[in-house]
Amino acid sequence: MPVRLAVPEVDSIGPFNRLSASQVNAYTTCPRLWYYEKVRRFKMPQIPVLFVGRAVEEAFCRMLQESPALLVAGAAADTLSNIPLDDSGVPSRDSGATWPADRLLPLPVNQWPSTMDTLRDWAKQRLETHLPLALHAMEIEWEKDERKAGQWSSVDPERCMSMCLNGLEMNLAEGERCLEAKGGPELDAWRLGKRPYWPSPDGRAYEIPLRHPLAQEGAVTLVEAWEIARPWFVDPNAGKFAMNAIHPEHWFQGEYDLVYRWDGRINIVDLKASVGAGDRSGNYVEQLRMYAMLWWVTHNREEQVDALQIWYLGANAIKQIEVPTVAEME
């Protein structure tokens, strides 16, 4: 499971005192700077690039959440935004809650993308809808920050869109693999409406009572492959840090960017809106290795990650990270 919530009865540490991969890397890189930021609470200058990455990731995930069998390319950006949340900001498990995608009727099948090019065109238009809104929201947040530095005019929307499109191509490659694998091992279960305990966010409820509304017959279709290969990610509408994976002893937590699992393997992906040439790039490797450990311990030390990847959206490159051994994780 990509999410493991805290158990309040035994959590003596609390959400603000847990370690994270970024804190570990910050301390390893410069203990003094870590002390100033985490202990003395000094806040470093907040430059626009720190906010741009969040905007790119949000636009990308909102596109992933959507289905070309439900939404036309020009649909409103907030079509799937009104999801029910519990008091902690986690998507609600209330069986009586109303979910936006469950209220939509599928488009006629003859309007579904039938080629990779038409699917790509649809997804690109969805990104063009979501990215400007995400950038605007981040600009407002940056403007309100008392430690803001630099100029928002330094943000290049075209470069941000280029990074989103690079991510799209990487995800389409997963969809193409799913097509070639004839839907993978979960095709029949998906068509029957069976879902993991933490399903990939698609605007639907945790459980589908009957057959999946987009299920077809015979060979897997392109739209089915899009749906099946959709990775898990934090629902863009969930509360901030509401969907962490928390160590059973509550001293460490992490939030995965993408988890691909359609083929029966676990591939954790970290999205980076950069080219990977900075001083911190080495920390990204250790961050993913810590995530592999976190996955292992939150699955009773019985399930290991199969692959770790960093998607450098600025460089249009995928970096494969060696998965740590059990001995290393212990």
PLM regions: where:
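Alpha-helical architecture
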Residues: 27-28, 55, 255
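Short loop/turn segments at secondary-structure transitions that flank enzyme active sites
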Residues: 33, 42, 62, 66, ...
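Short, hydrophobic/amphipathic alpha-helical patches that form generic packing surfaces
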Residues: 33-38, 54-66, 166, 170, ...
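C-terminal, charged and often intrinsically disordered regions of DNA end-processing helicases
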Residues: 1-49
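Hydrophobic (often cysteine-bearing) scaffold residues that line and stabilize catalytic clefts
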Residues: 48, 52, 160, 164, ...
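Short, charge- and proline-biased low-complexity linear segments
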Residues: 43-56, 308-314
